[in-house]
Amino acid sequence: MPKMKSNKSVAARFKLTGSGQLKRTRPGKRHKLSKRSSQQKRNLSKQPLVDQGQVGMYKRMMLV
């Protein structure tokens, strides 16, 4: 049986922390930032944690 492949799009979007939680990036930080305030852009840089109800699904997709 061949090796299982991880979902590359999920692996690129999420980072696994040391405690087993997943960090994600916020959307809206790529282009057209001139209309946003400095505070908005700074808050978009923060990486929130994924909700606990979805962590298991994403970990299975990442083969962790």
Swiss-Prot record:
Species of origin: Chlamydia trachomatis serovar D (strain ATCC VR-885 / DSM 19411 / UW-3/Cx)
Record keyword Phosphoprotein present: no
Name of the featured protein: Large ribosomal subunit protein bL35
Keyword Nucleotide-binding: no
Record's GO cellular component terms: cytosolic large ribosomal subunit
Region (Disordered): 1-55
Family (UniProt): Belongs to the bacterial ribosomal protein bL35 family.
Phylogenetic placement of the source organism: Bacteria, Pseudomonadati, Chlamydiota, Chlamydiia, Chlamydiales
Keywords: Ribonucleoprotein, Ribosomal protein
